[in-house]
Amino acid sequence: MRIINLFILSFILLPLSADDHKVMPGGEVGEFHYIKAKNPLAIVAATDKFIASDCGQKWQAKSRGLVLMQLDGSGMSHFFYSGFDDYESMNEAIQLASSCAAGLEFVQAIGDASHGEYYFNRIGELSLQKGDWTKDSVFLKYDLFVDPMKRGDYAKAWSSLVESQDTPGSSGLVTHVTGNGRVSHFAFNGGPSVPELMSGAEETFSSKEFLEFAAEVDEYRTVVNVMMVTPVKAWVKE
């Protein structure tokens, strides 16, 4: 888990508060590439090969890291997440990977090892976060649609709920910039293990604060799906 923990730590642009109960700005933008794998081992091998290439090393220098996540509770099997400090770094990395042979071979290899007709991607911003991701090895991911006119209200209500809970693991709210017609955001909660993650979720859902939160946001927030997310492998700058 050490490489995953280092990857997660590298994603945090702003230093975390000593108070793990405080919600802070995330300060990061990223790409989410969703796939339905036919051969997960081939997908990992193709990523290893790309990252080891000269082009991959240059791409990695522009990014905060790349991680492959496994999904349970979704029609897709995995997603890649690549994080960046800002849109300028993202643009430079995209231009680099799309103009080198190793990058094009990587895309082809991922296509060969997955069901290409199911692929989709989104760009998202880590708008808010609480806690230290490096202590987490599994996550619950809540795909949401929030009324555009109420998104500020939702962020405020979500922050209040998260800060009221004394559960293990991190929390975050990601705002989709593209691909947001059906899912405008996702929220996540992390934990050190599946039992602790589920126990924390049960504790939150049975709390007075959650009942108040649900009543407040019910008219403008829809939960589209809930998934469990497990890091498979991360590729980070040495």
Where are each of the predicted segments found?
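Short S/T/G/P-rich N-terminal loop/turn motif that feeds into the first structured element of a domain
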Residues: 18-238
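Sec-dependent signal peptide recognition
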Residues: 1-9
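Hydrophobic h-region of N-terminal signal peptides that target proteins for export
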Residues: 9-17
